């Protein structure tokens, strides 16, 4: 059952999206395809990201009231009830941002496995058994990003760029 859910909602769509972009992008650049599939996923998750950001802003605004409740009410159960009531009044769900995180983790794992294992064969090979009917098998697949960086090799500059991008995000 969990394998069905994994393949239906995470791995197969990501793998097929990646292969689609490899076929669509001139030269079959896998690096650009990874960027394209990432942008598509970010766009799909944008409404959840906006909601999580709004929740965080409201949480910061009501933080003084939460501290006041904790000081005023010693009983933990009563504290929890009062806090949930405050969240309800503010119109937020404190667990909304957790949903986004739990959704992003399997998507990231699916993208990693799509590139590294690709349904049994790592890129540049394509497992045609996993392709949807409308996703063509690409003629050319280039593991060289923008014609100068082999993405299968270790690269300190790319690792540094990724670290800086993650830090600024």
List where the protein language model places each region:
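Helix-loop-helix
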Residues: 1-169
């Amino acid at each position: 059952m969990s394998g069905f859910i994994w393949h239906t909602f995470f791995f197969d769509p990501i793998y097929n999206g990646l292969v689609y972009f490899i076929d669509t992008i001139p030269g079959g650049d896998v690096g650009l395809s990874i960027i394209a599939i990432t942008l598509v996923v970010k766009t799909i998750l944008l409404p959840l990201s906006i909601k999580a950001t709004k929740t965080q802003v409201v949480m910061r605004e009501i933080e003084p009231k939460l501290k006041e409740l904790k000081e005023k009410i010693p009983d933990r159960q009563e504290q929890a009830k009062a806090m949930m009531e405050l969240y309800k009044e503010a119109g937020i769900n404190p667990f909304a941002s957790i949903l986004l995180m739990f959704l992003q983790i399997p998507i990231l794992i699916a993208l990693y496995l799509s590139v590294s294992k690709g349904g049994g064969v790592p890129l540049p090979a394509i497992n045609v058994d996993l392709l949807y009917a409308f996703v063509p098998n690409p003629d050319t697949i280039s593991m060289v990003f923008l014609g100068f960086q082999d993405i299968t090799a270790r690269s300190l500059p790319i690792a540094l760029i990724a670290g800086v991008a993650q830090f600024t995000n």
